[in-house]
Amino acid sequence: MSTNLRKTHPLAKIINNSFIDLPSPSNISAWWNFGSLLGTCLILQTITGIFLAMHYSPDISLAFSSVAHITRDVQYGWLIRNMHANGASLFFMCIYLHIGRGIYYGSYLYKETWNTGTTLLLLTMATAFVGYVLPWGQMSFWGATVITNLLSAIPYVGNTLVQWIWGGFSVDNATLTRFFTFHFLLPFTIMGLTMMHLLFLHETGSNNPTGLNSNTDKIPFHPYFSYKDLLGLILMLAFLLTLALFFPNLLGDPDNFTPANPLSTPPHIKPEWYFLFAYAILRSIPNKLGGVLALLMSILVLFLMPALHTSKQRTTQFRPLTQILFWSLIANLLVLTWIGGQPVENPFIIIGQMASILYFSILLILMPIAGMIENKMLT
């Protein structure tokens, strides 16, 4: 009897063990769909991005016009651009839901998978930031100026570092060219790291809603989860197309319809919605260096999650105290997102400061304490 080529061929074997015969817990819910959705987002963004790059000119005198040219003159250019711009928003929605799932179900205890995942988040944020600068609209230019300028808060080397990143004494042509380079390069780095993320995940196998070992109850990924993921994929694409075709500018900033002008500052400089929570944390600290450190820590705190786990149980599924804290954290992040989009005036300043303190308190202090209290309640 001849063996199945799928299981013997060196390349097909890898694909088979990752996507076809992969033993998966039988009880994983729809919250486990987001990994495959993120993979799809990455492929979609890369394809649309490559097609956009074919028609884009990374020069300050041409960038804005070339984007207008894409939307007006290129066959389906408007669709490619709208899908790329809104695809980024969808990417971040899926990322945040994926991370939220990881925190709720204690997936961060797979340390290698969690750390590569957090690094992937940082790389994706960097990619989105440099990509936002490329259309060279008002918000692109001023966003780049404000965010890169934060590095000047670094003692001693700050100013030199900022000028080195700019390639001059202000955000100019050199900045746009290198940002385009980074925006093209980083997604491929993300792809490499994604493979590492999957490699580490397949070393341990998937977690499941109970947080218990599921080795005694595994089912093959295909057809069970391939079809289940396909449903999620169809829903996601339906949502993306609805956004791109009916409300293409819903999540964008109107200031970006104005070409970049270094002599005129927009009334409210703010990033895209997916960075607003971090931007609110940055603004809530009156000191420049302190703000930059808080901004960094708002993401880097994820690396500390495995070390801060005090509970005997893995998931939050059966821990009411931690559940309350988890949902308070989600509500708090929504408040921070809202504050990030508001002007710097009362009462928004104080709300932002309180929400920032609460964000770090929940993650660093309250959740570990709740875990210990719940352990005591069990004994």
Swiss-Prot record:
Cellular compartments annotated: Mitochondrion inner membrane
Note describing how the cofactor binds: Binds 2 heme b groups non-covalently.
Residue stretches spanning the membrane: 34-54, 78-99, 114-134, 179-199, 227-247, 289-309, 321-341, 348-368
PROSITE patterns named in the record: CYTB_CTER (PS51003), CYTB_NTER (PS51002)
Subunit organization: The cytochrome bc1 complex contains 3 respiratory subunits (MT-CYB, CYC1 and UQCRFS1), 2 core proteins (UQCRC1 and UQCRC2) and probably 6 low-molecular weight proteins.
Family: Belongs to the cytochrome b family.
Listed name of the protein: Cytochrome b
